[in-house]
């Protein structure tokens, strides 16, 4: 059975605040498989493509400035229902609206510094994965405990 994949990025504020391990751990404990991981300071071109849907919005320039201000941890996670589940783990875009127990609910306060990005649907996930990763950077592998996490 082919598993779904999603793109997740820990933004510069999450990296600077030392939250990478905490965030990775939440996805791993949930049972998702990490198939792509890299640290990169995005170029303005990459940021512009990533946030292209917001190009005409007044906050676009600030978004690009912020995401290019420092290192980002770009990840691809794989698992059954990973896109929707990742969105639940991440929490509402506005941290003050995010439920306690979510990444943003526990670790963020301000919408402009909300720590993490996650794809919002299958088409977006595929676009973002292809934008940030080459096929060679993604690893197909089988965790030794897979039968304990996923019913066949």
Curated annotation (Swiss-Prot):
GO terms for molecular function: ATP binding; metal ion binding; nucleoside diphosphate kinase activity. Gene3D superfamilies: Nucleoside diphosphate kinase-like domain (3.30.70.141). Its cofactor is Mg(2+). It comes from the Bacteria. Disulfide bonds: none annotated. It is found in: Cytoplasm. Keywords: ATP-binding, Cytoplasm, Kinase, Magnesium, Metal-binding, Nucleotide metabolism, Nucleotide-binding, Phosphoprotein, Transferase. Its EC number is 2.7.4.6. GO terms for biological process: CTP biosynthetic process; GTP biosynthetic process; UTP biosynthetic process. Major role in the synthesis of nucleoside triphosphates other than ATP. The ATP gamma phosphate is transferred to the NDP beta phosphate via a ping-pong mechanism, using a phosphorylated active-site intermediate. HAMAP family: NDP_kinase (MF_00451). Belongs to the NDK family. This is Nucleoside diphosphate kinase. It comes from Prochlorococcus marinus (strain MIT 9313).
